Amino acid sequence: MSGDRFYFKLALHRCINEIWYGRNFWQYLLVPFACFYGAVVWARKMAYESGVLNVFRARVPVLVVGNVSVGGTGKTPLTIWLASRLTDFGFKPGIVCGGYRGRAKSWPQQVRADSDNYVVGDEAIILAANTSVPVVAGPDRGQSVKALLEKHDVDIVLCDDGMQHYALARDIEIAVINGVQRLGNGKLLPAGPLRESRERLAEVDMIVCNGIPARGEFAMKYKADELRKVGNTE
């Protein structure tokens, strides 16, 4: 049964990729749902910006790293790099993240390199293991920032994957884009891969491209720190 489930997920993933990143007529059938989704996203954003919904503002600057599309674009590696560079320049950064796939009974959670990934999720542990700064995980970014500032001496907060979390005020926004897939077919979910419209990118302070950048974007490249033996080879 587990094998059947694996192949089903693989087939579903391929189907979604064809719709989002290729030319597939199914994307047009999903456009009405994308319009509804876009209206909800816009209304939610306006509710925070107009003060209808409360926004938490930290006493220190908040730098958000995020994107407008679903999937991995390099947000976490960039957050790790920023934490390292800020530390080198004498700042005392702290990181908050969503705790994606974590199953903690209560949030937010203080994260260490040896924390249980079942509780806080893999990404939170990756952040803690690859930086020397405090990390707090939780789906409510505002509460996570509060917990971070209450327990740690931090003078700047890095928020990993936080662009759509408008309940948290931010001072700087960095959007990360996959240099190969870019924005796919340019449509909103579920017709395309976008969480927000491409126009949202005009509001950010910087666009970082994980790959070959377009005009006005900054390039990002992965660089290996070390080689590790992962198998028993003679």
Residue ranges and their predicted role:
Residues N67-S69, M163, A224:
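Short, well-ordered turn and helix-capping elements at secondary-structure junctions
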Residues G99-A219, E226-G231:
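Phosphate/Mg2+-binding loops and adjacent switch elements
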Residues V40, T79, V120-G121:
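Generic non-transmembrane alpha-helix signal with a bias for helix starts/N-cap capping motifs
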Residues R23, S69-T73, V135:
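Residues at alpha-helix boundaries and short interhelical turns
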Residues W42-L53, A214-E234:
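Short N-terminal or domain-adjacent regulatory/targeting segments
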Residues G3-P61:
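A transmembrane-helix-recognition feature enriched in membrane-embedded lipid enzymes
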Residues K45-A113:
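Walker A (P-loop) phosphate-binding motif
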